[in-house]
């Protein structure tokens, strides 16, 4: 069932989150960026969001994969979009006024196996981008490939006594998973930091139950979002994500010369403007976008 644009859908709950005055231009009626509170529930503001988006001739819709389009699972290879989420994303991809993109920490090759080919892909936190037959890889990723291999071999040795920790080679980057492992995050991070210290040109960052290792280049999900929006000269941009690495994308929305909105999946302090509860809330939001907020045709620049 498609969500009610009044916001009374069970997946896009209304709540007593209060509006705050002031704020940046765009879809939000307040300045959530500096708040200590979690973003407001999106269901409280659907009527306003619909009014803004329905006037925009083109929307770039960017979404994380794990925890956003697909539930978090113990084994990352088993993560998959629920059928109803996949249908909702495909339906939006069929709209000429919508350009959906998945912006993920997963490798581009991994995303290709999971996502409809009509959807733009930004892998490894934006170090790789594929749109149709076009593919781009950040030059810094190739330059630091051997250093990354050495560092990950070092990490694997340091964590050998924790068999449930897994090092995933993603080509341009690597991820050390410790969900369900005996090793806590501090132990894993210490092992990664020690390995990275011996390899100039690499940097470690935290994710949800993971530590990411990547080339030390000025590139993150926010850069990917800016480029995707600018390439299409979009009139509106929406980013949906759950991870701490998605905060770069939420922050980048402020720099865009168009309507913009960040949607957090879950509840925590965030630079996002709104939130939904979970992957099913994302599904409801995608269906609502298709049915209520994004006309199938029309519009102009």
Which residue ranges define each predicted feature?
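Short beta-strand
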Residues: 165-169, 203-206
């Amino acid at each position: 069932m498609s969500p009610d644009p009044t916001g009374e859908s069970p997946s896009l709950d209304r709540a007593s989150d209060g509006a705050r005055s002031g704020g940046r231009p765009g879809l939000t009626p307040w300045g959530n960026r500096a708040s200590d509170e979690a973003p407001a529930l999106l269901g409280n503001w659907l009527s306003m969001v619909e009014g803004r988006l329905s006037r925009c001739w083109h929307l770039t819709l960017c979404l994380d994969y794990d925890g956003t389009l697909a539930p978090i699972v113990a084994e990352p290879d088993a993560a998959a979009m629920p059928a109803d989420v996949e249908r909702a994303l495909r339906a939006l991809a069929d709209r000429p006024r919508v350009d959906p993109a998945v912006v993920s920490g997963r490798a581009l090759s991994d995303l290709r196996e999971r996502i409809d080919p009509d959807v733009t892909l930004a892998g490894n936190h934006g170090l790789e981008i594929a749109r149709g037959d076009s593919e781009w890889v950040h030059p810094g990723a190739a330059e630091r490939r051997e250093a990354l291999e050495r560092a990950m071999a070092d990490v694997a040795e340091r964590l050998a006594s924790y068999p449930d920790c897994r090092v995933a080679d993603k080509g341009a980057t690597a991820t050390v998973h410790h969900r369900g492992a005996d090793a806590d995050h501090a132990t894993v991070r210490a092992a990664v930091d020690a390995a990275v210290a011996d390899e100039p040109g690499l940097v470690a960052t935290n994710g949800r139950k993971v530590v990411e290792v990547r080339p030390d280049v000025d590139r993150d999900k926010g850069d990917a979002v800016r480029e995707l929006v600018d390439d299409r000269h979009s009139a509106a941009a929406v980013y949906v994500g759950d991870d701490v690495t998605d905060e770069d994308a939420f922050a980048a929305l402020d720099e865009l010369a168009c309507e913009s909105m960040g949607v957090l999946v879950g509840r925590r302090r965030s630079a996002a403007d709104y939130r939904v509860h979970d992957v099913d809330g994302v599904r409801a939001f995608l269906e609502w976008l298709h049915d209520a907020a994004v006309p199938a045709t029309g519009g102009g620049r």
